[in-house]
UniProtKB/Swiss-Prot annotation:
Recorded family membership: Belongs to the complex I 49 kDa subunit family.
Gene Ontology terms describing biological process: mitochondrial electron transport, NADH to ubiquinone
EC nos: 7.1.1.2
Tagged with keyword DNA damage: no
Enzyme class: translocase
Function field: Core subunit of the mitochondrial membrane respiratory chain NADH dehydrogenase (Complex I) that is believed to belong to the minimal assembly required for catalysis. Complex I functions in the transfer of electrons from NADH to the respiratory chain. The immediate electron acceptor for the enzyme is believed to be ubiquinone. Component of the iron-sulfur (IP) fragment of the enzyme. Component of the iron-sulfur (IP) fragment of the enzyme.
Protein name, UniProt field: NADH-ubiquinone oxidoreductase 49 kDa subunit
Length: 398
């Protein structure tokens, strides 16, 4: 009798739910084990590694040029920015400076990549929350940007355009004019997206005061990029530790006040506007001259040289098969990627292959704080929080 009464009075509310890895809002292969009390989250345990490919080890068995395409495939939404980080690391180890024109072109494409990333982030996030139109508009604009990729590299995504020593090839005829036209048109499209979302009552109810991160938490967890700036800390490597020609272009660093999902959305919208300013400056001040270093051992020979010189043909063959040797040493190069600080720690033993290449991906640090960000929120808020973290598992798992 006693046992029956005990069972009758006991009510079990807590249960465990698997979120992903096949969930459309998981942004890849994220598996979350959620401990729920009704619809309230008590704990979220992220399981990663489902996209692990051993990238860092693969790079150690390739020469410095052959390692470059692996960086396109880490965060496969922010391709050229990662090429940029790797190229800077190799150039610092080698002790070489690249021409001004190549630096301006690199910055131009870094900002094109930033817009590519943020359009996808906001579009997919809005789709997860329930707004469909921004995703369709965003993909329409991304097509135009991918066409710019295609015109300089032949590829829409994995470009391998920013290379150690400069860039692969010069801008084609009419390219500057087309980018200028895009900047003018895209400003209007940004206004339209903001008109749909920024003051939308449902959008704000889903984002405001959801997934709050304090400045102290952000620093303790190694946050960078939009998630760090949403807490009110104006840390941007383009301004804090300028590389290439970022100290010569005017732009502002948008920061948040609450550190919630809505702040992160607003910052991404403002960052796209600042990217347009930087792109306009690149078009205005783009100098003439060479797009590659003049160090013949570090860059391949030009096409016209190979048509006139057998030595150039031999050099071309050896360059792409054996690569170049980099002096022994170590360096760390970081760039402000759309998701945060993308860093490459490179150790050379004096051979033509990296002895060690450690990649610092911002998404890995952001994801480790997901349990704290989701605690005591509703299960529907998990989608909102993951969306504003802007996670891509190519860089998290590597």
């Amino acid at each position: 009798m006693f046992i029956k009464r005990k069972l009758k009075e006991t009510e079990i509310k807590d249960f465990t739910l698997n979120f992903g890895p096949q969930h459309p809002a998981a942004h890849g292969v994220l598996r979350l084990i959620l401990e729920l009390n009704g619809e309230t989250i008590k704990n979220a345990d992220p399981h990663i590694g489902l996209l692990h490919r051993g990238t860092e080890k693969l790079i150690e068995n390739r020469n410095y040029l052959q390692a470059l395409p692996y960086f396109d495939r880490l965060d496969y939404v922010s391709m050229m920015v990662q090429e940029h980080a790797y190229s800077l690391a190799v150039e610092r180890l080698y002790g070489i400076n690249i021409p001004q024109r190549a630096q301006w072109i690199r910055v131009l494409f870094s900002e094109i990549t930033r817009i590519l990333n943020h359009l996808l982030a906001i579009g997919c996030h809005s789709m997860d929350v329930g707004a469909m139109t921004p995703l369709l508009w965003g993909f329409e604009e991304r097509e135009k940007l991918m066409e710019f990729y295609e015109r300089v590299s032949g590829a829409r995504m994995h470009a391998s355009y920013i290379r150690p020593g400069g860039v692969a090839q010069d801008l084609p005829s009419g390219f500057v004019e087309d980018v200028y036209s895009f900047i003018l048109d895209f400003s209007v499209r940004l206004d339209e997206i903001e008109e749909l979302l920024t003051n939308n009552r449902i959008w704000k109810q889903r984002l405001v005061n959801v997934g709050i991160v304090t400045a102290k938490q952000a620093i303790q967890n190694g946050f960078s990029g939009v998630l760090l700036r949403s807490t009110g800390i104006p840390w941007d490597l383009r301004r804090s530790q300028p590389y290439e020609i970022y100290d010569k272009v005017p732009f502002r660093i948008p920061v948040g006040t609450r550190g919630d999902c809505y702040d992160r959305y607003l910052i991404r919208m403002q960052e796209m506007r600042q990217s347009l300013r930087i792109m306009m400056a690149c078009l205005k001040y783009l100098p003439g001259g060479s797009i590659k270093s003049d160090d013949k051992k570090f860059v391949p020979p030009l096409r016209w040289e190979m048509k006139n010189s057998m030595e150039s043909v031999i050099h071309h063959f050896k360059y792409f098969t054996e690569g170049f040797k980099v002096p022994a040493g170590q360096t760390y190069a970081a760039v402000e990627a759309p998701k945060g600080e993308m860093g490459v720690f490179l150790i050379s033993d004096g051979s033509n292959q990296p002895f060690r290449c450690k990649i610092k991906a911002p998404g890995f640090f952001h994801l480790q704080n997901l349990p704290e960000m989701t605690k005591h929120h509703m299960i529907a808020d998990v989608v909102t929080i993951i969306g504003t973290q802007d996670i891509v598992f190519g860089e998290v798992d590597r």
